[in-house]
From Swiss-Prot:
Residues 1-45, 110-179 are annotated as: Disordered. GO terms for biological process: cell wall organization; chitin biosynthetic process. Its main location: membrane. Residues 17-28 have a biased composition (Polar residues). It holds the Pfam family Chitin_synth_1. It comes from the Eukaryota. Belongs to the chitin synthase family. Class I subfamily. Residues 130-140 have a biased composition (Basic and acidic residues). This is Chitin synthase 2. It catalyses: [(1->4)-N-acetyl-beta-D-glucosaminyl](n) + UDP-N-acetyl-alpha-D-glucosamine = [(1->4)-N-acetyl-beta-D-glucosaminyl](n+1) + UDP + H(+). Disulfide bonds: none annotated.
């Protein structure tokens, strides 16, 4: 740790480190080799003999740290005068005084503990202190940057004698929102290892509402720490940046590191997520009988908020962050010493809670549980994967957490869901990743009135009842949803050659420019790549688990265009990632998994390969089933001529709609043609109703035909292969859905969403698949390019290694700015009316006109050819025996395949329930 060298180096004493080397506990440097290990408590015990008269700092007090408190920086215009005022005349240089004008060596020996040095061993930031033979040189390095009244610094709100008359305002653009002009004063700040790090006092109005250290002491509640990162996330630790948790008198160990990634979410979505996180932390603090958690559990948890781009963050969300105390406007810098700032890092331990009244966000002071917040505001919009790089590579390396939890802004975790995820890792030492149940936010069931939301709710529920439990039973989950999942930090680390899960995961950030279409689409689902690489990590045996008791609620698209765009990325990413996993399944054999586990993985990947083939041929299979059912309705035993005519009409409209869907998908944005997509969804829904009627009608007719025979018996019904296959397929699908839902005690979606899902099934097969495969060239996440943010001031180094910064000083201004931030979300936001972009509107018009012309031309030509050649249904009068036989065989294969896959999923879900019951019994014996 680096300090300014203060006072005369000739100072000596009976317990001086120079006189008694055994008392020297400073961090090693080239001039001072590493000493034997000393227990941290001994460092505190040696305070008694020292001449320093300082109050003893507790573990939670921020002792000497490499940040500069902005309220203690002296006016550069009166620099010489203040130098004479504060520098004592005696050579003692303040020896024995209760401030920072003391020997930094002795202060270091008394308060700093070697095992928690934030700097690499052997990399001391300053040269060794001058020897006794060297003359004393009162250069600028000997002038203290900070001169507080105690070991913790002065109280920022009661310090008298601060003279602002000589301060000058910096002639720079006013930041937005504009603070009071007198708030902007120019101060000189010494860079720490070339990095700009500031301790900023929080507004007195905020401080008055929360417990904090009494003056003149300071703690994590009185100051917000700002760091201007000028490096890549992977270089954060190497550039000697650190975080507040490592700077306490006794550095805190992080058990749980939670990241909330956001883009431009409003204050309601952000507050919803943070309220859920706060409740989880409070839950863990209330577990008084736990071996790991308890009253002080919040000290083991750090909540990191990463915002993707300074120009993208919602101003009202930023105001909520300011209300929590973890953001202050006007502190950030554009450049430091000529280097562009890549991220603005704010740290604060908040005691302010949040609450929602409808859609209105309000603050709740004096929260029972403090929360350590880390807010990283990225300068540029670089997508979510870059936000995870800051979380894992930058902050994770400094804090070295045990478990990392990933949450998207807008996802609300259950009151104990984060704890339930953590418990899965605690019970299973080889659990490398876990996920919970993602629920659709239904607003007390009101959103179920939207068929699209109801369909997605059913899809999510069945995935959490059949798919996730099945995969968890085998030990490999194809995807841990990025909206709510957790990883063991050590399991993600790369090997000594830099190869591993994180290396593969972050590869997708920079490869789009020169990668092939296959690889680029694969990295649209980089979380799937991470899951596979984690399980197949060389010489390891990590597994993935599904935690049913951990839930996270999230919003889903409620309009067709947004839904299509979302599924385009999901389908393309999941399909190509599945191909990658199947092609690299051999990597599982280089792991340390048992032979039985590897065999289970092989069975699971075989199952996934079959599913992948069904997904590839889904559009063809659906058409064939449609053709067979409509053809069967045209026989004399069923509807006769009426059935034939209806079949021809539906087939024409089917092919025309399918063709139109291809045309729209290849050149039009769903946002530009919402009515066209809505019409297609309506047609496919009507078609599914028709097919459902056809299935039921044919089943009834088959039973009637068998009953009318003279030698009828109940067993003869099942001798009909077509009827038996249809019954088995329907029973294995729909009946097992009901049974599995009741086994998981979650059957309500079967009564509220089942019909909507059945009706919209053709939309999933045709519209979504066609749009996805027709846009495999689109490797974006559906967000536009980065908007340019307002330019911030820069911090350039002056002679002497100092920089000028704009800092807050006046209590009135701090309160005024704090009030202005609170007012931003104190009222309901005005209804946003998105004005269409003229360029996009014109482009949509041209593409829509092109699509309509091409569609009309192709349909008219198709009708002409069909009528002249008497094909495409006109020749369907008699069904040949061979054609009938082939159709029967094909239909039987499809129906029995569906039955087999459904039964396989049901078996896996039942096994998951058995294992879960056993785990609960184990947990009840050894509570954590």
């Amino acid at each position: 740790m680096a300090y300014n060298r203060l006072g005369s180096p000739q100072r000596d004493g009976p317990y001086s480190p120079s006189a008694q080397p055994q008392y020297d506990s400073r961090s090693p440097s080239p001039g001072r080799p590493l000493q034997p290990y000393i227990h941290p408590d001994e460092a505190y015990a040696r305070q008694q003999p020292l001449h320093l008269q300082m109050p003893t700092a507790s573990d939670d007090r921020l002792a000497m740290q490499p940040t500069y408190s902005v309220e203690n920086v002296h006016n550069p215009q009166a620099y010489g005068q203040q130098y004479g005022q504060h520098l004592p005349d005696s050579g003692d240089m303040g020896y024995g005084r209760n401030d920072y004008i003391v020997s930094p060596e002795e202060h270091h020996d008394a308060y700093y503990t070697q095992p928690y040095s934030p700097h690499p061993q052997g990399d001391y930031a300053l040269d060794p202190y001058p020897s006794h033979d060297e003359p004393y040189r009162p250069d600028t390095d000997n002038v203290p940057i900070l001169q507080p009244d105690s070991a913790y610094g002065p109280d920022p709100h009661t310090q008298p004698g601060m003279d602002y008359d000589d301060y000058q305002e910096e002639p720079r653009p006013t930041p937005s929102p504009a603070p009071i002009r007198r708030w902007k004063t120019v101060k000189e700040v010494q860079l720490f290892n070339g990095n700009l790090v500031l301790d900023c006092p929080v507004p007195p109005k905020l401080l008055a509402n929360v417990p904090h250290a009494k003056p003149p002491e300071r703690d994590e509640f009185t100051h917000m720490r700002y760091s201007a990162a000028t490096c890549d996330p992977s270089d954060f630790h190497n550039e000697r940046f650190t975080l507040r948790q490592r700077l306490f008198a006794k550095p805190r160990q992080t058990e749980l590191f939670i990241v909330v990634t956001m883009y431009n979410e409003d204050e309601f979505l952000f507050a919803r997520t943070m309220i859920g996180v706060f409740k989880n932390i409070e839950f863990m603090c209330n577990r008084s009988s736990s071996k790991t958690w308890g009253k002080e559990a919040w000290k083991k948890i750090v909540v990191c908020i990463v915002s993707d781009g300074r120009a993208k963050i919602n101003p009202r969300t930023r105001a909520v962050l300011a209300g929590l105390g973890v953001y202050q406007d006007g502190i950030a810098k554009q450049q430091v010493n000529g280097k562009d700032v890549t991220a603005h890092i704010y740290e604060y331990t908040t005691q302010v809670g949040l609450e929602l009244k409808g859609t209105q966000v309000s603050l709740k002071p004096r929260s029972a549980t403090p929360v350590q917040l880390l807010f990283c505001l990225k300068e540029k919009n670089q997508k979510k994967i870059n936000s995870h790089r800051w979380f894992f590579q930058a902050f994770g390396r400094v804090l070295d957490p045990n478990i990392c939890v990933l949450i998207d802004a807008g996802t609300k975790p259950g009151k104990d869901s984060i704890y339930q995820l953590w418990k899965a890792f605690d019970l299973e030492p080889m659990c490398g990743g876990a996920c919970g149940e993602i629920k659709v936010m239904l607003d007390h069931g009101k959103k179920l009135l939207n068929p699209l939301v109801a369909t997605q709710n059913f899809e999510y529920k069945m995935s959490n009842i059949l798919d996730k439990p099945l995969e968890s039973a085998f030990g490999f989950i194809s995807v841990l949803p990025g909206a709510f999942c957790a990883y063991r930090y050590v399991a993600l680390q790369n090997d000594k050659n830099g190869v591993g899960p994180l290396e593969k995961y972050f590869k997708g950030e920079t490869m789009h420019a020169d990668a092939g279409v296959f690889t680029a689409n694969m990295y649209l689902a980089e979380d799937r790549i991470l899951c596979f690489e984690l399980v197949s990590k060389r010489n390891c045996r990590w597994i993935l688990q599904y935690v049913k008791s951990a839930t996270g609620e999230t919003d889903v698209p409620d309009r067709i265009p947004e839904f299509v765009l979302q599924r385009r990325r999901w389908l393309n990413g999941s399909f190509f990632a599945a191909v990658y996993a199947v092609a690299h399944v051999y990597q599982l054999w280089r792991t340390d998994h048992s032979f039985l586990r590897k065999l289970m993985f092989l069975i699971e990947f075989t199952y996934q390969t079959i599913n992948m083939l069904f997904a590839w041929f889904a559009i063809g299979n659906f058409f064939l089933v449609f053709r067979l059912l409509t053809a069967s309705l045209g026989t004399k035993e069923t509807l006769g001529t009426a059935g034939t005519v209806l079949g021809v009409v539906f087939e024409f409209v089917y092919l025309g709609t399918l063709l139109y869907c291809f045309i729209l998908s290849m050149g039009n944005r769903p946002q530009g043609n919402p009515k066209s997509y809505m019409m297609m969804v309506i047609f496919w829904s009507v078609l599914m109703v028709w097919l459902t009627f056809a299935s039921i009608f044919l089943t009834v007719k088959s039973i009637e035909t068998e009953v009318q025979q003279k030698d009828f018996s109940f067993s003869t019904i099942f001798n009909n292969s077509t009827f038996f296959g249809l019954i088995v397929s329907l029973a294995s699908t729909y009946v097992l859905w009901f049974v599995a839902s009741f086994l998981f005690f979650d059957p309500w979606h079967m009564f509220t969403c089942f019909l909507q899902y059945i009706v919209l099934t053709p939309t999933y097969i045709n519209v979504l698949n066609i749009y996805a495969f027709c846009n495999t060239h689109d490797i974006t996440w559906g967000t536009k390019g980065d908007d340019k943010a307002e330019k911030l001031p820069s911090a350039n180094v002056k002679p002497g290694g100092k920089v000028d910064v704009l800092i807050p000083q006046d209590d009135g201004d701090l309160n005024a700015q704090y009030d202005s931030e609170l007012k931003k979300f104190a009222t309901k936001p005005p209804k946003e009316v998105k004005a269409p972009n003229p360029a996009d509107k014109q482009e949509d018009y041209y593409k829509s006109f092109r699509s309509n012309v091409v569609t009309a031309w192709m349909i008219t030509n198709f009708i002409l050819v069909a009528a002249v050649l008497n094909i495409a249904g006109f020749d369907r009068i008699n069904v040949h025996d061979t054609q009938q036989q082939n159709s029967t065989i094909y239909l039987a294969v499809i129906l029995w395949s569906v039955a087999g896959l459904s039964l396989f999923r049901f078996t896996g879900a039942c096994w998951f329930l058995v294992v879960r019951m056993v785990s609960l019994e184990i947990w009840s014996v050894c509570k954590v």
